[in-house]
């Protein structure tokens, strides 16, 4: 039987930050379905997220997510972890591919300084950065004028390209712990990102696009979802632009994933 792939964004897609008792039956239903199809239907599951592996595992533990996807691509899919012997192990092979070209914080800070001076704006680090990072992320607070925001961010993206760096941005989601009225600014190596991770998995398992379904909720999911034949935006998404571009799930969060994964597996088994 041919392998199939199921790909999930994490925050506010696979994981609901405000999970409550009413959500637990749907969470258990989703878990049971994923366990069954992984064991019986040649299905590979993976999380593609901007969060760190530590953050993902902490949140999964918080709501007792006992099912473990085979792969987690953290830090905007610049790191790959595989479930093996009851723990997630980082892939050195993937790490070497990601860092095949120079990726330096000093270069990124210089890029930001140039655009910051030009537009008289500020880019704020989201955390304390360590050595040899594969993701450098910043916040940019909205000017109150969406058109002006996009002009500044597109300028930053284009200038980054002239410096041989990849920068993406998306509107922040306060439900996922982000600040209000802000944008995520993400710098990753060229060999990284959710689309890159998707193609790596397709090649690794020999899965064609028509046998993949992907779920997301925000702008940083657009590239990989646009690439797939079966792509879903969560109905609980706060991103109206993304909801207008993709098919929306019938239900939010766990119930939505359960419903559409089951439909996808049953359709492919016909």
UniProtKB/Swiss-Prot annotation:
UniProt key word GTP-binding: no
Keywords recorded for this protein, A-Z: Hydrolase
GO MF: magnesium ion binding; phosphatase activity
SUPFAM superfamilies in the cross-refs: HAD-like
Keyword Endoplasmic reticulum belongs to the record: no
EC number: 3.-.-.-
Any single Pfam family the record assigns to this protein: S6PP
PANTHER family per record: KANOSAMINE-6-PHOSPHATE PHOSPHATASE, PHOSPHOSERINE PHOSPHATASE
Family membership noted in the UniProt record: Belongs to the HAD-like hydrolase superfamily.
NCBIfam families given in the database record: HAD-SF-IIB
Protein name: Uncharacterized hydrolase SE_0147
Organism field: Staphylococcus epidermidis (strain ATCC 12228 / FDA PCI 1200)
């Amino acid at each position: 039987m041919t392998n199939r792939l199921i790909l999930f964004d994490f925050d506010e897609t696979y994981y609901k930050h405000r999970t409550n008792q009413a959500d637990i039956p749907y969470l258990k239903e989703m878990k049971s379905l994923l366990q069954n199809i992984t064991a019986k239907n040649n299905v590979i599951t993976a999380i593609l997220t901007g969060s760190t592996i530590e953050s993902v595992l902490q949140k999964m533990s918080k709501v007792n997510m006992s099912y473990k996807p085979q792969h987690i691509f953290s830090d905007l899919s610049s790191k790959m972890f595989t479930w093996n012997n009851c723990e997630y192990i980082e892939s050195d092979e993937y790490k070497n591919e990601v860092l095949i070209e120079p990726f330096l914080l000093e270069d990124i800070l210089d890029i930001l300084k140039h655009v910051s001076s030009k537009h008289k704006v500020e880019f704020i680090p989201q955390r304390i950065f360590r050595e040899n990072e594969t993701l450098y992320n910043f916040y940019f607070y909205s000017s109150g004028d969406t058109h002006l925001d996009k002009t500044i961010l597109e300028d930053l993206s284009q200038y980054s390209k002239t410096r041989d760096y990849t920068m993406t941005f998306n509107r922040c989601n306060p439900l996922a712990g982000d600040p209000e009225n802000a944008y995520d600014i993400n710098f990753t190596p060229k060999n990284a990102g959710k689309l890159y991770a998707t193609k790596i998995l397709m090649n690794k398992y020999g899965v064609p696009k028509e046998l993949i379904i992907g779920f997301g909720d925000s702008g940083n999911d657009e590239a990989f979802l646009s690439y797939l034949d079966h792509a879903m935006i969560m109905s609980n998404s706060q991103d109206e632009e993304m909801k207008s571009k993709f098919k929306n799930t019938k239900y939010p969060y766990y119930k939505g994933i359960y419903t559409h994964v089951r439909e996808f597996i049953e359709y492919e088994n016909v």
